[in-house]
Design a protein with these regions (language model features):
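Conserved catalytic core of nucleotide-sugar-dependent glycosyltransferases
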Residues: 92-159
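A conserved acidic beta->alpha catalytic loop
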Residues: 38-46
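C-terminal catalytic/acceptor-binding lobe
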Residues: 148-239
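Short aromatic/hydrophobic "clamp" motif used to bind/position activated sugar donors
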Residues: 82
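N-proximal low-complexity "stem/linker" segments adjacent to membrane-targeting elements
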Residues: 1-22
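Conserved donor nucleotide-binding strand/loop of the catalytic core
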Residues: 50-64
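Glycine-rich, basic loop-to-helix element that forms the pyrophosphate-binding segment
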Residues: 60-76
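Short, acidic, metal-binding catalytic loop of nucleotide-sugar glycosyltransferases
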Residues: 23-31
Length: 239
């Protein structure tokens, strides 16, 4: 039985999914499983994922949303701990897995580890780390509820606090990559990188793009994506 389930929600983002998966393989030392909830990608964008024997790929016919994918992934996971990543995030260094477990288990009050969000929401979605049993036993959902929250897992944040527990929020810090995005720090080190709007303009399936970027914004999107995938550390992960 694996100790950690690494889960992400994917839709038509093959290059981001590959980078995340390969970073998990490279930098994870404990026993783990990888679960990818695919929200209706085109067949051409699943070719690489379908060839990976160590990935449990759940292919859905339509997009159930990020929060629903978190709930589904948690339910089918087999591990004590769950690390749910944005698909356009990846791990930057070894030790991340044991350090998150140490942080979580070091305080009985901590029931969710996330990332400090912008002013209008308490959490940012590059990473959520939690214990499966606690989430399921307390019927905590990560669904996006428009009237109650501003993004995925915001209600879960308040539900956990209202139960008398704590949510540990990791900070963003100094960057290794010179790209638009956040580098999440753990124990003072860059540990997880999250590309801003990495999947917002979906060149792999333009019909499903979430936001229409044009002009300077579109130019910056592709420039930063190119810079990231040409960075020596990313090239090393993708080998």
């Amino acid at each position: 039985m694996p100790e950690l389930s690494v889960i992400t929600a994917n839709i038509d983002s093959p290059e981001w999914a590959e980078l995340l998966v390969k970073s998990i393989r490279k930098f994870t030392s404990i026993d783990y499983e990888i679960i990818i909830i695919d929200n209706g990608s085109l067949p051409k964008n699943l070719i690489w994922l379908e060839k990976q024997e160590d990935i449990k790929l759940i292919k859905l016919s339509s997009n159930i949303g990020h929060g629903n994918a978190m709930d589904l992934g948690t339910q089918i996971s087999r591990s004590k701990y769950v690390a749910f990543f944005d698909v356009d995030s990846h791990v930057q260094r070894p030790g991340w897995d044991k350090e998150l477990i140490e942080l979580y288990s070091g305080d009985d009050k901590i029931k969710l580890i996330g990332v400090i969000g912008p002013e209008h929401k308490p959490l940012h979605p590059p990473l959520f780390f939690y214990e499966k049993e606690f989430i399921l036993e307390n019927n905590i959902s990560f669904k996006y509820l428009p009237r109650l929250s501003t993004d995925t897992a915001q209600k879960a944040y308040w539900d956990i606090l209202n139960m008398g527990f704590k949510v540990e929020r990791l900070e963003k810090g100094e960057k290794i990559y010179n790209c638009i995005g956040d580098e999440i720090h753990l124990n003072g080190k860059s540990t997880i990188y999250h590309m801003w709007y990495g999947t917002r303009f979906n060149e792999n399936n333009p019909d499903k793009k979430k936001d229409k970027l044009d002009g300077y914004a579109l130019e910056e999107h592709f420039k930063n994506k190119k810079q990231l995938f040409e960075h020596p550390k990313v090239i090393e992960i993708l080998k």
